[in-house]
């Protein structure tokens, strides 16, 4: 370990993350510190995005495993909704999903993120812990509860490299004001 660094180690299940950062007490003896530089707005945006991806990557690694569901909830073409309506639909969907999970004695874990497609259509990505028993499974429950369009479901095979967290944390563009 180099002098002037702090090492944090994060146990994320199958992976171990090591983060090294400056202590803030660096510089040679007898030399004055350089004047502090104000970060530019671009630096702040870049730093905030890096922290968002880092925290989301750890959250995904701690709470989800291989075999969980990556679901895209879409709206029917003739029934496009506003941003506010989409938020209400999603809150209602999550409430119903929690009720159904509790009914079977399961714990619901999810991360959801709205997105606007290339042609302006709103859709929602949701990472969901997959559960099943002899009666039902997560995919069947989602198909029953999402009545606004077609849920597209995929199985998550790799959570180690953080690509999924990076995709979820991508900043929204051209979003209607809240």
Q: Where are the language model's segments positioned?
A:
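Sequence-level detector for tyrosine residue identity
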Residues: 5, 10, 22, 26, ...
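DNA replication initiation on ssDNA origins
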Residues: 1-58
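Signature for HUH/AEP ssDNA processing cores
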Residues: 45-119
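N-terminal nicking endonuclease/strand-transfer module with a His-rich metal-binding environment
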Residues: 8-28, 61-64, 69-72, 130, ...
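Intrinsically disordered, low-complexity Ser/Thr/Pro/Gly-rich regulatory segments
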Residues: 36-37, 79-80, 131-137
């Amino acid at each position: 370990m180099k002098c002037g660094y702090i090492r944090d180690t994060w146990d994320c299940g199958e992976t171990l993350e090591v983060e090294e950062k400056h202590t803030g007490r660096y510089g040679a003896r007898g030399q004055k510190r350089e004047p502090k530089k104000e970060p530019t707005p671009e630096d702040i945006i870049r730093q905030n995005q890096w922290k968002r991806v880092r925290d989301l990557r750890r959250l995904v690694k701690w709470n989800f495993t291989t075999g969980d569901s990556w679901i895209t909830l879409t709206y029917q073409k003739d029934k496009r909704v506003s941003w506010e309506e989409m938020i209400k639909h999603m809150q209602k969907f999550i409430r119903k999903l929690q009720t159904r999970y509790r009914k079977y004695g399961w714990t619901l874990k999810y991360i959801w993120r709205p997105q606007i497609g290339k042609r302006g259509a709103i859709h929602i990505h949701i990472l969901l812990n997959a559960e099943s028993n002899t009666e039902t499974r997560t995919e069947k429950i989602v198909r029953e509860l999402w009545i606004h369009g077609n849920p597209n479901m995929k199985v998550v095979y790799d959570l180690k490299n953080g690509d999924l967290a990076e995709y979820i944390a991508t900043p929204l563009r051209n979003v209607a004001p809240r």
